[in-house]
Structures are given as structure tokens and as C-alpha cells.
């Protein structure tokens, strides 16, 4: 589906170095950069109205040694991001943000990210996914502990790619 959220995510990934082509009818061709291969983007990454894109992309870049600023539309800039910033900081990632942890947020990825064990205080597929994506670039095992299950789309995708073991 070529929704605004999907287009914003594709544009963000292209700015990080991926090559993405929409071939129509929901078919996309993606040439990735590999784990640790994100490049420094030339511009701010605009996630439009997609909180999922903002949170997952912040997770993905949090363990890459690059600096990225994320923003969004007026609605997204009113939504708090602290629930994802707290665990990502444990990787060694630094953030510059306003007092209430809303977009725009500048992410300085860790040069040598450390693996983490993080217990989710409340169920959140977005926070869990951000941590898992960040963990891909941290040397060692990153673990997310859930007291109550949340959606597992990211785990299924990573397992299908043989990137994690559940």
C-alpha cells in the first residue's frame, strides 16, 4: 500500500542510503545498506504523521554512528517520544530534544553501541520494535522482556530474515 506513512518511511530510508523503487500495485524493490551501513543523511528526516516511522527509524539509527534529526507534521510534533528515547539511550545513544521529548529530535548514534536488556513497563510494539532494530547493530545480545505481549510483526520479520532467534 502506498500510503503517506509508507512514502515517508521509504524517503527516510533512501536518505540513509537505501535504494527503493515502487513498482506499483504494492510491489517495492529495496536494496539495503546492511547492518551498520546507514550513511549520514543530508537533511532532516520528515516522518509526516507516522509515529511508527519516527519511533522505528530512531531505533534503527540509534546504534549507527551518525547524526539524524527527525521531525513530523504538526500532529506528530505534539506526541511524546520519551517512551522510546529512554530504552534507546541505554545503547549509548544521545538525544537533543525539547523539554517534553517531542519532535524535532536530534539523534546521535552510539559509536560503540552496547547490547541491552530492557523490560517494557507497558506493552508497546513500537518501543519493542525500535529496541530490536537498534539491537541489530549492537555487538552481543539485546533482549526485550515483555510482561504482557504486544504485536509481534517485527519479530516475525527479523526471524524470517534469520536475524533473531525467538
Task: Give the location of each predicted region.
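Structural preference for solvent-exposed beta-strand-turn elements
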Residues: 1-164
Amino acid at each position: 500500500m502506498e500510503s503517506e506513512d509508507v512514502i515517508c518511511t521509504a524517503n527516510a530510508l533512501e536518505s540513509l542510503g537505501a535504494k527503493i523503487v515502487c513498482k506499483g500495485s504494492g510491489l517495492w524493490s529495496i536494496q539495503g545498506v546492511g547492518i551498520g551501513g546507514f550513511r549520514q543523511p543530508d537533511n532532516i528526516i520528515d516522518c509526516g504523521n507516522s509515529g511508527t516511522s519516527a519511533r522505528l527509524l530512531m531505533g534503527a539509527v540509534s546504534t549507527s554512528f551518525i547524526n539524524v534529526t527527525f521531525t513530523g507534521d504538526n500532529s506528530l510534533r505534539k506526541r511524546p517520544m520519551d517512551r522510546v528515547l529512554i530504552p534507546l539511550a541505554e545503547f549509548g545513544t544521545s538525544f537533543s530534544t525539547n523539554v517534553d521529548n517531542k519532535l524535532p529530535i536530534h539523534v546521535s548514534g552510539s559509536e560503540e553501541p552496547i547490547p541491552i536488556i530492557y523490560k517494557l513497563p507497558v506493552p508497546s510494539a513500537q518501543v519493542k520494535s525500535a529496541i530490536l532494530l537498534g539491537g541489530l547493530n549492537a555487538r552481543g545480545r539485546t533482549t526485550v522482556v515483555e510482561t504482557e505481549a504486544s504485536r509481534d510483526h517485527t519479530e516475525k520479520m527479523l526471524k524470517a530474515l534469520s536475524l533473531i532467534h525467538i
